[in-house]
């Protein structure tokens, strides 16, 4: 039997889910190739999952031949072009949601697939979510509650990109995009249950004002008429509490399908008198909910221990969606075909039509390096610290070149005529060399990337920092300001006073990967600068807070959810907070300060609340019941050892947890930043009320609503 050879078009985060789903659902399928314009990303995935073919574009893959099926995981606005080319090349296509960004594109793909005799399927995997499937069996297959008379759907979910202010993401570019990106999940279940709606009435709340020229439609309501069944839909994006559920009211009971909790609740009737019926039905419902909750926890743990196949809802939905697609290939059909995908896009287009088109926002275009002749280059300048830095540089009238991988979707301050946006990747030497051409000073805010093991961290975090320094020296850069982190220091001794001359942790190899990477990057940079004569200054900010980042910093503890902060210790020691504005000021000062080459400076402000105090301030400002839970390092270490033991039992090769790292995360050491104040002329905010206004009060309402 000839094996089906499959290619993945796109090596982003969802590709791993497709690979795992393919291996579980269709082990007879050979994952033969992976394609991505970022070839290094594709090579990394190929190495991780033993995929033999790696290509930089689909034309290269098509020319090589031998591919039967392609999973299109490219950005949504590329779906139509990529899928159309693959179909024309005689390749069956499995499209990630949304099918395309317009009904016209969907119809063109449907016609192309039909004319060429190819299979076109859409991955609306939440139609295969086990909780939804359980509800569907009760409502449709078994008809246990009679006809569905009304359906009420709530989809109120967090949105990571909104909290991280990643406004360059495709979903923020126009109102329909968030619907295509997120709303298709609940819509797919509505259409699967009741069919496409014949009529739609939609409304949207006043949008959030994310930035000058950019609004975001975060709340929607819609009435859909699906046959004789009315559907009420509520959508909210960027919410604190994850609530995804639907209630089906039927002739003989109601069903609540809670996708967030993985539970289905059925309320019916028994044969008893009403007072007794309520008791019997209520007790049965309680027992059923408890049983589902226990079963879900048991399934997760046994799956984690590999005592049974992996069974979390998302994985199962991906596995079963992929399985259904491949099961249909012999008959040349797809369970969720182009018509299904097009119906969802049609609903999104209709809903978006209820919202006035936003005014065109001013966006900078990527330009060639010689356009402004700036003497200052900033790598990683579009992040949290970078945005504040660029704002201050622009306010001072300084011309600056910002290197960004998303050069076509930036907002103020990056639209200033003093800012040159250059598309580039700090991991690519040729991009770094091109960016530094003609400059005299540079700032490196880019962290370089992460990794699952030390070799990858050394390549991304340490290697990229060193490569920027090497390119800076070769380009004749007079001063390179590298922005690292206090994480590379050992900060667990309450008796130690830490200054800029305190060296990186001498036992960094015993620390967690991030801390070790920061420590080794500092060491490598100092060694290179000493040997080459590069004018290097290293700045190590503390816990950076302020407008534009999450309210709760990871230096406070870790979070099983954002309402509960599990402290790194008892939470009674002063923490090394610093305002983002003060960090930006220090970077600018370090560009020109005399006699600072070859030195490091820690950036910690003069207002230093404890973890308990800071969490309490945030809770008060946001009017939310956020709690700090003090811990002892011994307990934390024991818990980490337990988790490490589980990973080892499942065959994972992982290093044991470092108690030294946990102690250091408590940040008990004392910081003396007198050297930064003396040498740089740095003056961080010392007024407690002003600190609270900038670090805490800004989170009362991160975004205003547009008029």
Where do the language-model regions lie?
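N-terminal Rossmann NAD(P)H-binding glycine-rich loop of SDR-like oxidoreductase domains
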Residues: 11, 374-396
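Conserved Rossmann-fold NAD(P)-dependent oxidoreductase catalytic core, especially the SDR/UDP-sugar
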Residues: 123, 463-514
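NAD(P)-cofactor binding segment of oxidoreductase domains
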Residues: 84, 103-104, 441-442, 452-482
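Predominantly a Rossmann-like dinucleotide-binding segment in NAD(P)-dependent oxidoreductases
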Residues: 127-203, 208-212, 525, 557-561
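Contiguous beta-strand/loop segments that form the cofactor/metal-binding neighborhood of enzyme cores
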Residues: 187-273, 311, 317-332, 349-350, ...
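Amphipathic terminal alpha-helices
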Residues: 346-375, 671-679, 683-707
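NAD(P)H-binding glycine-rich loop region in Rossmannoid oxidoreductase-like domains
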Residues: 415-463
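Beta-loop-alpha module in the N-terminal Rossmann-like domain of NAD(P)-dependent dehydrogenases
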Residues: 18, 53-110
């Amino acid at each position: 039997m000839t094996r089906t050879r499959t290619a993945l078009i796109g090596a982003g985060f969802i590709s791993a889910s497709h690979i795992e789903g393919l291996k579980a659902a269709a082990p007879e399928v050979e994952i033969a190739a992976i394609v991505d314009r970022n070839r290094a990303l594709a090579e990394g995935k190929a190495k991780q999952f033993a995929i033999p073919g790696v290509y930089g574009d689909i034309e290269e893959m098509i020319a090589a031949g031998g591919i039967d099926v392609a999973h299109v995981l490219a950005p949504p606005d590329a779906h139509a072009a990529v899928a159309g080319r693959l179909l024309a090349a005689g390749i069956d296509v499995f499209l990630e949601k949304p099918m395309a960004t317009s009904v016209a594109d969907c119809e063109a793909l449907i016609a192309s697939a039909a004319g060429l005799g190819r299979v076109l399927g859409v991955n609306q995997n939440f139609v295969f979510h086990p909780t939804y499937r359980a509800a569907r069996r009760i409502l449709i297959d078994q008809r246990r509650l009679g006809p569905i008379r009304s359906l009420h759907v709530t989809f109120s979910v967090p949105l990571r990109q909104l909290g991280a202010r990643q406004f360059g993401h495709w979903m923020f570019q126009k109102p329909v995009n968030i619907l295509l990106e997120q709303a298709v999940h609940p819509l797919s279940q509505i259409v699967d249950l009741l069919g496409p709606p014949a009529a739609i009435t939609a409304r949207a709340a006043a949008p959030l004002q994310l930035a000058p020229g950019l609004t975001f439609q975060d709340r929607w309501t819609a009435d859909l008429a699906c046959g004789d069944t009315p559907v009420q839909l509520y959508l909210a994006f960027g919410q604190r509490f994850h609530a995804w559920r639907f209630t089906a009211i039927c002739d003989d009971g109601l069903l609540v399908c809670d996708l967030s909790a993985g539970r289905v609740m059925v309320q019916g009737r028994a044969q008893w008198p009403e007072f007794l019926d309520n008791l019997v039905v209520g007790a049965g419902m309680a027992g059923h909910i408890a049983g589902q909750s226990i079963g879900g926890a048991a399934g997760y743990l046994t799956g984690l221990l590999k005592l049974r196949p992996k069974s979390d809802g998302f994985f199962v939905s991906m596995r079963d969606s992929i399985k259904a697609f491949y099961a249909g290939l012999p008959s040349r059909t797809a369970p969720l075909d182009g018509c299904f995908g097009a119906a969802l896009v049609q609903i999104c287009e209709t809903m978006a039509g209820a919202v006035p088109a936003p005014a065109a926002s001013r966006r900078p275009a990527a330009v060639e390096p010689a356009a402004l002749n700036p003497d200052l280059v900033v790598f990683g300048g579009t992040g949290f610290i970078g945005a504040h830095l660029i704002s201050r540089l622009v306010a001072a009238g300084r011309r600056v070149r910002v290197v960004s991988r998303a050069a076509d979707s930036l907002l103020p301050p990056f639209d200033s005529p003093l800012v040159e946006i250059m598309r580039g990747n700090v991991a690519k030497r040729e991009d770094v060399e091109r960016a530094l051409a003609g400059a005299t000073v540079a700032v490196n805010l880019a962290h370089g990337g992460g990794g699952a093991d030390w070799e990858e961290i050394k390549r991304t975090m340490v290697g990229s920092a060193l490569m920027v320094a090497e390119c800076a020296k070769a380009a004749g850069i007079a001063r390179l300001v590298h922005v690292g982190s206090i994480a590379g220091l050992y900060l667990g001794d309450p008796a130690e006073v830490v200054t800029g001359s305190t060296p990186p942790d001498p036992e960094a190899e015993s620390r967690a990967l991030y801390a070790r990477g920061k420590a080794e990057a500092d060491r490598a940079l100092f060694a290179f600068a000493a040997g080459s004569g590069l004018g290097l200054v290293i700045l190590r900010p503390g816990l950076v807070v302020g407008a534009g980042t999450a309210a709760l910093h990871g230096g406070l503890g870790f979070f099983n959810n954002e309402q509960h902060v599990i402290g790194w210790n008892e939470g009674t020691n002063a923490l090394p907070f610093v305002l983002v504005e003060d960090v930006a000021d220090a970077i600018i000062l370090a560009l020109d300060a005399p006699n600072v080459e070859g030195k490091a400076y820690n950036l910690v402000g003069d207002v230093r609340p404890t973890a308990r105090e800071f969490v309490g301030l945030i809770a008060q400002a946001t009017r939310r019941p956020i709690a700090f839970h003090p811990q002892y390092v011994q307990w934390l270490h024991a818990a980490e050892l337990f988790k490490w033991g589980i990973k080892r039992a499942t065959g994972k090769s992982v290093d044991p947890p470092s108690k030294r790292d946990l102690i250091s995360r408590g940040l008990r050491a004392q910081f003396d930043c007198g050297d930064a104040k003396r040498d740089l002329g740095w003056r961080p905010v010392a007024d407690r009320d002003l600190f609270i206004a900038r670090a805490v009060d800004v989170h009362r309402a991160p975004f205003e609503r547009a008029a």
